[in-house]
Amino acid sequence: MATGPVVHPQPVRGDPIDLKNAAAKNRRALGDIGNVDSLIGVEGGKLNRPITRNFRAQLLENAQVAAAANKKAPILDGVTKKQEVVRAVQKKARGDKREPSKPIEVIVISPDTNEVAKAKENKKKVTYSSVLDARSKAASKTLDIDYVDKENDLAAVEYVEDMYIFYKEVVNESKPQMYMHTQPEIDEKMRSILIDWLVEVHVKFDLSPETLYLTVNIIDRFLSLKTVPRRELQLVGVSALLIASKYEEIWPPQVNDLVYVTDNSYNSRQILVMEKTILGNLEWYLTVPTQYVFLVRFIKASGSDQKLENLVHFLAELGLMHHDSLMFCPSMLAASAVYTARCCLNKTPTWTDTLKFHTGYSESQLMDCSKLLAFIHSKAGESKLRGVLKKYSKLGRGAVALISPAKSLMSSAP
């Protein structure tokens, strides 16, 4: 059955009209649903006249004139709030001649700007400890060796003193003990041969100095914990070099390259197994203050030139080859290398207040270790182990291996 729109019957003229329903239909539009016109409610309460188009335009024009006088944003029709219109009309009616308020300057600060500002503010702050350090240095005539790096954020000048205090406190925790009496198949000569060979490999691969010192530290710590047969000593050395290279270098040598330098005495699997064995025995503890960490600081405190710096490294690497150097901690070995080098070059004074302050050692405390280094230096030319001597005989390193040993330390050398 088709459906269509329903047509309601229209009232016939003369029929009675339902006044009750008609009253409901004749309510004022928008009078009770909250959509109140924004221009109703000006001064004097309710308007006593209907809002015509002309009257509404007049009110809006008055409000815009008042806003322009106050240097405010122009009022758009239907957007301005009721209170703003009321204030504008009232102000115009009473002729308020107060000066308009000045616009507020808004400064937008990004999070990065906040961090930079805080960093600069913290950098300008002077701590009480830094004041005490500065006074103590001035009293003892020590030089501020970090002055040139104060503007270099990477130098971490504000932390460097605390870092080296910490290094000196923990240096003995990673210091290897003298262990030759616990190794039935290895002696001091074999260890010296191994270190000399590692120096040549280190030069061949052009590795950083940190890698060499960490390699020797790993070897000595491992041999002080575990007995190693003679046939595996070179395997321990090359595996320690691999570990140190992975820790210090951006591009460590490949395992196959290390197999090659051993003349295929070991295969890659043996090197990787020994690497895992060493790390397990050391409990993966590789972040240690080696002798090189202190050498960098003490050379800076010495105010040395390139010749003195090369000579210090030469003496330190000669000391690495000798088992007797394990009697001394890395910080003392580094300080003694600086002292011995200054004696070789006849620097005056031999030991300054600045060196004493930064190393923590007096001249008398370094005497035994310095005499040992001077003795090793004097015997280097007679030794068959030429790795370190060849390295520092080149002009690129100042040929410092040709410098004579310190005579002042040789008179009572061991």
Swiss-Prot record:
Tell me a Gene Ontology molecular-function term this record carries: cyclin-dependent protein serine/threonine kinase regulator activity
Key words of the record: Cell cycle, Cell division, Cyclin
Tissue localization of expression is:
Expressed in roots, stems and flowers.
Q: Which residues form a coiled coil?
A: none
Specify the domain of life of the species encoding this protein.
Eukaryota
Task: Spell out the CDD domains in the cross-references.
Answer: CYCLIN_AtCycB-like_rpt1 (cd20567), CYCLIN_AtCycB-like_rpt2 (cd20511)
Q: Which GO terms describe its biological process?
A: cell division; mitotic cell cycle phase transition
Cited Pfam families:
Cyclin_C, Cyclin_N
Which PROSITE patterns does this chain map to? CYCLINS (PS00292)
Give the family, as the similarity comment puts it.
Belongs to the cyclin family. Cyclin AB subfamily.
Q: What name does this protein carry?
A: Cyclin-B1-3
